[in-house]
């Protein structure tokens, strides 16, 4: 099944994959060779640590390759949805109780990072936003309780 992902998200994953393959993988191969040179592998902590790290890196490479092979890349800058909220939209919300403003971009599940304001398309926040437009009010059921927000801006920025 194809997973929607922004162009920016795909670039980030490709950069990580390239770094793992061209920098981390050779480093770990050298570390294993160096640890082997120290002799007995049964009690060689450096060797076992390097092999464990190699296993982690190879697993992450496989994971990234799989994610990228299933990505449906969407160039947000080319979307023409106007003020309607769809995948890729950057949305500015105002909490109707506190007047606090927040800004989120709706992205694919694999690229979500709430600290960077990237919310997954499958998240409760994104589900409440999809299909709405500037001026609409949304209600989000959060662990801290029910919150009401007004959509004050919708942008499509790559």
Swiss-Prot record:
Keyword Coiled coil listed: yes
Pfam families with a match to the protein in the record: GreA_GreB, GreA_GreB_N
MF GO annotations: DNA binding; RNA polymerase binding
Gene Ontology terms: biological process: DNA-templated transcription elongation; regulation of DNA-templated transcription elongation
Domain of life per record: Bacteria
InterPro entries according to UniProt: GreA/GreB_C_sf, TF_GreA/GreB_CS, Tscrpt_elong_fac_GreA, Tscrpt_elong_fac_GreA/B, Tscrpt_elong_fac_GreA/B_C, Tscrpt_elong_fac_GreA/B_fam, Tscrpt_elong_fac_GreA/B_N, Tscrpt_elong_fac_GreA/B_N_sf
Gene3D superfamilies in alphabetical order: Transcription elongation factor, GreA/GreB, C-terminal domain, Transcription elongation factor, GreA/GreB, N-terminal domain
Coiled coil: 45-72
Entry keywords, A to Z: Coiled coil, DNA-binding, Transcription, Transcription regulation
The protein's role, per its UniProt record: Necessary for efficient RNA polymerase transcription elongation past template-encoded arresting sites. The arresting sites in DNA have the property of trapping a certain fraction of elongating RNA polymerases that pass through, resulting in locked ternary complexes. Cleavage of the nascent transcript by cleavage factors such as GreA or GreB allows the resumption of elongation from the new 3'terminus. GreA releases sequences of 2 to 3 nucleotides.
HAMAP family: GreA_GreB
Entry-linked PANTHER family: TRANSCRIPTION ELONGATION FACTOR GREA
UniProt family annotation: Belongs to the GreA/GreB family.
NCBIfam families: greA (TIGR01462), PRK00226.1-2 (NF001261), PRK00226.1-4 (NF001263), PRK00226.1-5 (NF001264)
Protein name, as recorded: Transcription elongation factor GreA
Source organism: Xylella fastidiosa (strain 9a5c)
Gene: greA
